[in-house]
Amino acid sequence: NVLAVGNGPVFLLAAKTAAAAGYPTTIVSARTELFNQLLWAEDEDRDANLRILGVTEDEDVTAFNEAVASADALIVAFDAEQTLTDTLLDVVLPAEGGASRVACLSKHLSGKGMGPFVTASKVAANKEVWCAPPERVEMYRSFEAKLKAKVAAKGGDVTIVRGGTLKGGGPGDPESVQTVAPTLAPRFYAEIVADLVNWQLLFDCETRGVELTPGDSAAGPGLQAVFTATASDARPGDSGRVQVAQALVRSLALDGAAGKEFGVTTKAARDHPSDGEWEAEFAKVL
């Protein structure tokens, strides 16, 4: 059983991907109706493996407590630049019982390829650009250390999946929809700020490949940042949400991923990677 916590499109995608991989998966939402519209296209069958709990009913709270206790694995995936609070971390990872395997989405923290141009592009072009400000880098580092210590204390393992600027997450245009990897519904594009929609949709059609990088070695866009911020092709510093979700979920089944960290970067491709291509990428970094 998998429990997924976080926020935003990458969180929903990770949960949908886990369910599609055959894991009974639980998430909690205060906005169940919107979540369902983002998760499932109108003509798409809902996956019985994915359970969305509300937060209002007593039975939801009971079901959530049961989901925490029965979880084998925990996925932590925040779209926004934030981490779990200490209180919530204690709730989803109790000292006794609960998940012993954790896949956590973090960021590239090395500072390579960052700097004033990247920071400027976040302000001017795309507020979702990852520009590695020192206080956020410290926040992620401190959370990773806390998470690893907590999981190690109960004999478990953490895999850290590092991303940069998160892009895409939907099915692409209607002509190019694929079923190899789960995506969010077309409604995803309606939720994006108007001037960001077109290149996100193009990204979901053109940049379906993935390249994994060992440890914390991936670089940001550097001087190119102003051009990469809203680019739909494969550029340094970017990570596709669909590929990040795949990496999080696939790492759970890989013994070699326990205790490891790696980065997810982009690669031009009209097709989502096959199982064989994923195996080859993991072999490079684990």
Where are the regions a protein language model picked out?
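Short beta->alpha junction loops
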Residues: V55-E57
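Oxidoreductase cofactor-interface core, primarily capturing Rossmann-like NAD(P)-dependent enzymes
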Residues: N1-L50, E59-A71, D79-Q82, D86, ...
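Hydrophobic beta-strand segment of the Class I
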Residues: L74
